[in-house]
């Protein structure tokens, strides 16, 4: 889980099974939010949450994410972990990890995972531009699209790690046979 992790988590490890997942792209000004369908196949944008200057457990951004997790009945939350192309972590990764730790305390027992999000914002911006979205006022949409990229990558990797209808515990038992 987040508290002891140095790097990103791997999908399928301690998998909670069927249910919606929420992904967040933590920025210094905004937080992009995406959700999956209950079967964990498709990621879709939810909203962009303004980032609060407060850093406590009752900060408005944390409260809004908690409400979204509750509203969507999420079984897992994935937080994008920005790393360099060499896999190193800088200031942005520290901010995302700190946010993930605060969120974990607020939504327990729902697991909060870190996922490598290299180039998701670049990919999201390019995809929006190619679909004809104008640059002006695009930042909130880019944040949501980046969260979709983070979540879709997690879901795709999870589908390779966990067969439909089985949890990671089932897969581990199967490997012991």
From Swiss-Prot:
* Region feature Disordered, mapped onto this chain: 1-20
Q: Which UniProt keywords apply?
A: Cytoplasm, Hydrolase, Nuclease, Ribosome biogenesis
User: Which Gene3D superfamilies does this entry report, sorted A to Z?
Assistant: YqgF/RNase H-like domain
| The protein's Enzyme Commission number | 3.1.-.-
GO BP, sorted A to Z:
rRNA 5'-end processing
Superkingdom to which the source organism belongs: Bacteria
Q: Per the record, what is one GO cellular component? A: cytosol
Q: Per the database entry, which stretches of residues form a coiled coil?
A: none
Q: Does the keyword Hydrolase apply?
A: yes
Q: Could you tell me where this protein is found in the cell?
A: Cytoplasm
Task: Please tell me which top-level EC class this enzyme sits in.
Answer: hydrolase
Keyword flag Hydrolase: yes
Q: Which GO terms describe its molecular function?
A: nuclease activity
Tell me the protein family, please: Belongs to the YqgF nuclease family.
Query: Main role?
Result: Could be a nuclease involved in processing of the 5'-end of pre-16S rRNA.
Q: Name it.
A: Putative pre-16S rRNA nuclease
What is the originating organism of this protein? Rhodococcus erythropolis (strain PR4 / NBRC 100887)
């Amino acid at each position: 889980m987040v508290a002891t992790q140095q790097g990103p988590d791997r999908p399928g490890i301690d998998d909670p099974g069927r249910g919606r997942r929420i992904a967040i792209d933590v920025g210094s000004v905004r937080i992009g939010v995406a959700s999956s369908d209950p079967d964990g196949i498709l990621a879709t944008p939810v909203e962009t949450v303004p980032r609060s200057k407060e850093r406590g457990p009752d900060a408005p951004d944390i409260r809004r994410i908690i409400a979204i997790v509750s509203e969507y009945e999420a079984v897992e939350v994935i937080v994008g972990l920005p790393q360099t192309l060499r896999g190193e972590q800088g200031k942005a990764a520290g901010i995302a990890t700190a946010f993930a730790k605060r969120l974990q305390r607020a939504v327990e027992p729902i697991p909060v995972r870190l996922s490598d999000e290299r180039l998701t914002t670049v990919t999201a911006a390019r995809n929006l531009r190619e679909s004809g979205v104008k640059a002006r006022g695009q930042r909130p949409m880019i944040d949501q699209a980046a969260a979709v990229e983070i979540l879709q990558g997690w879901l795709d990797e999870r589908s390779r790690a966990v067969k439909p209808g089985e949890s990671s515990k089932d897969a581990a038992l199967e490997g012991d046979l």
